């Protein structure tokens, strides 16, 4: 499983680089097994792990991650993406935990409004759109019995903003392809540009649903499942 996730992330990174959408990146590597766990993470997670959850304001967290080079992908508009995956080191190497964050830049105009500013290599550091509200997103997966609690802490969930207890149920975990495709389609698609349609397809099979029957009866986010 870790090989498929690694392939998806590497292929997506090469795709984004080839189309000039990234200004910087850090490659995630498959770590050696430790305590029955094998991680797929970039080096910044091992050296000085960033604190992605807490009361730090979005703008401050974004500036800190950028200054420390603590991200996997940095888009031309300054938006960051971080990926952290943990797999079982035995058996089929199933996914145990994951945390994927999208942190839009708090300082620049959004890509959709004027893509030529970014694709034309213009200097846009002083361009600020006061009407755009930047909100971080985090896709989490954690199937540990001690953590999971129906509705309050779904196995797979989406957090919008920095609300500590915001956990919108997802139908299942999301591999790198699905999160990156969502980000491209939701935040970088314009009437003439549809990057997500050319993104290399998923390597992984749709996972088994983790959402409970009760969670399905309420507002939730659906991902492709087996």
Task: State the predicted function of each range.
Residues 91-174:
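An exposed acidic His-Trp-rich patch
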Residues 62-65, 72-74, 90-92, 127-131:
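A general structural signal for short secondary-structure junctions and capping/turn motifs
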């Amino acid at each position: 499983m870790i090989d498929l996730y690694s392939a998806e992330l590497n292929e997506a990174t090469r795709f984004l680089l080839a189309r000039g959408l990234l200004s910087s990146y850090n490659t995630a590597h498959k770590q050696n097994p430790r305590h029955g766990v094998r991680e797929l993470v970039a080096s910044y997670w091992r050296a000085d792990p960033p604190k992605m959850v807490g009361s730090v304001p979005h703008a401050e967290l974004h500036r800190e991650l950028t200054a420390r080079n603590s991200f996997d992908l940095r888009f031309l508009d300054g938006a960051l993406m971080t990926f952290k995956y943990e797999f079982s080191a035995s058996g089929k190497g199933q996914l145990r935990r994951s945390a994927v964050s999208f942190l839009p830049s708090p300082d620049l105009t959004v890509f959709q409004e004027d893509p030529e500013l970014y694709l034309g290599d213009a200097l846009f550091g002083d361009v600020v759109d006061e009407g755009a509200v930047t909100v971080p997103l985090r896709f989490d997966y954690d199937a540990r019995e001690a953590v999971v609690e129906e509705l309050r802490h779904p196995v797979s969930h989406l957090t919008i903003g920095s609300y500590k207890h915001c956990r919108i149920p997802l139908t299942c975990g999301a591999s790198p392809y699905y999160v990156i495709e969502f980000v491209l389609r939701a935040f970088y698609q314009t009437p003439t540009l549809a990057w997500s349609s050319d993104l290399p397809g998923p390597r992984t099979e749709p996972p088994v649903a983790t959402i409970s029957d009760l969670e399905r009866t309420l507002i939730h986010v659906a991902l492709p499942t087996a």
